[in-house]
Amino acid sequence: MATYTKEKDVETALEDDAEARAAMQEVFSNTARWPAGFGGFTADATANINGVEHKGTVTVKGPKEIETDISDEKAKGFLTENLASIAMHRGPRSFEESDGKYKLHFGDDDTHPLGRKLIMGGDGMSSFYRIKDGRIQQINRQTPRFSFSINIEESRKNQDGKFLTHKYSVFYFNPETKGLKDVESYTDEYTRVGEADLPEKRRIINCEEGQIYVSTMTLSNHKLL
């Protein structure tokens, strides 16, 4: 995904909805995360950016603690950006540290194909989700540079019965004109190491200046730290 800085939380007059909070807490508990005290991992890594391949190793300790010995700047940036995103979403944290800190409120009924709209009151990115069957099916956020919508297409359960997202698409929009800027299609594979589901492969198909680009990140020989 395109990188962005999380906007500061804002004041909100929205009242917290107990039903929405309970639904979001269920979603949170259904999502696979690395175990508490997770120290990170190392792995052999291959970055293939539209046919140009670079190999090396990576060390992942957290979203802001990622190292690789690959010197090519484009491949290094590709690995770092995607591993940071995975570490952020899979990293251990409580509900109160994440979505639970906002005023949660339903924004419509339950007739949308992707589920009910759940508004995150107090979030500085005007975020709202759509949730259905105990899962987030859509994420919508706004930044000064672009707005985006993440649409979940397929999820799989790990050996603990928790969900890992397998396929999803991201639509980027111009915040002023609302015109479509870009589309990215993701496919993720995970491998179980100890009590953690670690990234094994990510494929991204996206359009850029009228051309289709395909990039893959492949990790192997994982070792826990």
What is each stretch, according to the model?
Residues 55-148:
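An acidic-aromatic
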